[in-house]
C-alpha cells in the first residue's frame, strides 16, 4: 500500500504473527490488481501459503496472482483442516466442500465472517521493508472512486443489520427500515429482489452476489429467504424474520 506504516505496526502487535513485510509506495495508493499481484509474485518464493480476505479487492487480486504462479486458487475458505486441506461453501452455502491442494504455493481467499478476529499479542515482531518491483505493465490505470457516505454503520462491520426484501413493495416503504435502523444504530441491507426492483442501490445487497455479513442480530423484513440471500447472512448470531 501507500503510507501504510501504521497498519504494519498494528499487524506486528497481532498474536501469532512472526514477521511483517511492508511494500510502501505511491504506486500502490489504489489497489490495481496488476501492480499488487506483481509485488506478491516478487516475494512469494519461500512461502507455502498466500491468503487474502474474500473482499472486492481480494477477489480482484488473487485470481491474477494464481495465474501468474500457475496454481489453482482456493476461494472463500471457512475452515482449515490442515496445511493442504480446506473447507469452502458450495451450492450457495447449502453444502461444504473439502478441498485438498497439491500445489507448492496455496493461493487462498478467506471468508472473514467464518473466523474470529485475531487478538493482540504480548509483544511486537520485526517489520521488514521490501523494495517495490518496477511496474512495467500499464494496461490498467486508476480513473477515480466515489465514497459512499452513510450515517449508519457499514454492512460488513455492523453488529445489527435490518434488511428488506421485495415484500417492502416500494422504495418509500423501504425508508421505514432506515428510521428503525437509526433507532437501533444498525446498518441497512437488502435482498437482490429489492435491489432489482429499484427500491435501493446495489450497495445495500446482502447475499451470494452481494456482501457477506455475520452480525450479532440480523432482522429480515419482507424477505422470502432465497438460498442466495441465506448464503450471505447465515452466520448471523440471531436472525429475526418479519413477514407480515
Regions found by a protein language model. Give the residues of each.
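N-terminal glycine-rich FAD/FM-binding segment characteristic of electron-transfer flavoproteins
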Residues: 1-244
Amino acid at each position: 500500500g501507500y503510507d501504510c506504516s501504521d497498519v504494519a505496526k498494528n499487524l506486528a502487535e497481532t498474536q501469532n504473527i512472526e514477521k511483517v513485510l511492508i511494500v510502501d509506495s505511491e504506486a500502490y495508493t489504489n489497489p490495481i490488481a496488476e501492480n499488487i499481484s506483481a509485488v506478491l509474485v516478487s516475494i512469494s518464493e519461500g512461502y507455502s501459503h498466500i491468503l487474502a480476505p474474500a473482499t472486492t479487492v481480494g477477489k480482484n487480486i488473487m485470481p491474477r496472482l494464481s495465474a501468474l504462479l500457475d496454481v489453482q486458487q482456493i476461494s472463500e475458505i471457512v475452515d482449515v483442516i490442515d496445511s493442504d486441506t480446506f473447507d469452502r461453501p458450495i451450492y450457495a452455502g447449502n453444502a461444504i466442500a473439502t478441498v485438498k491442494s497439491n500445489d507448492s504455493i496455496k493461493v487462498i481467499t478467506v471468508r472473514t465472517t467464518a473466523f474470529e478476529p485475531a487478538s493482540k499479542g504480548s509483544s511486537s515482531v520485526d517489520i521488514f521493508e521490501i523494495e517495490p518491483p518496477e511496474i512495467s505493465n500499464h494496461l490498467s490505470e486508476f480513473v477515480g472512486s466515489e465514497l459512499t457516505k452513510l450515517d449508519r454503520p457499514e454492512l460488513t462491520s455492523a453488529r445489527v443489520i435490518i434488511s428488506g426484501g421485495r415484500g417492502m413493495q416500494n422504495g418509500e416503504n423501504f425508508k421505514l427500515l432506515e428510521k428503525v435502523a437509526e433507532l437501533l444504530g444498525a446498518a441497512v441491507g437488502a435482498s437482490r429482489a429489492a435491489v432489482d426492483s429499484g427500491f435501493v442501490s446495489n450497495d445495500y445487497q446482502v447475499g451470494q452476489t452481494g456482501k457477506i455479513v455475520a452480525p450479532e442480530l440480523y432482522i429480515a423484513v419482507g424477505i422470502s429467504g432465497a438460498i442466495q440471500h441465506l448464503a450471505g447472512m447465515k452466520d448471523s448470531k440471531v436472525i429475526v424474520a418479519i413477514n407480515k
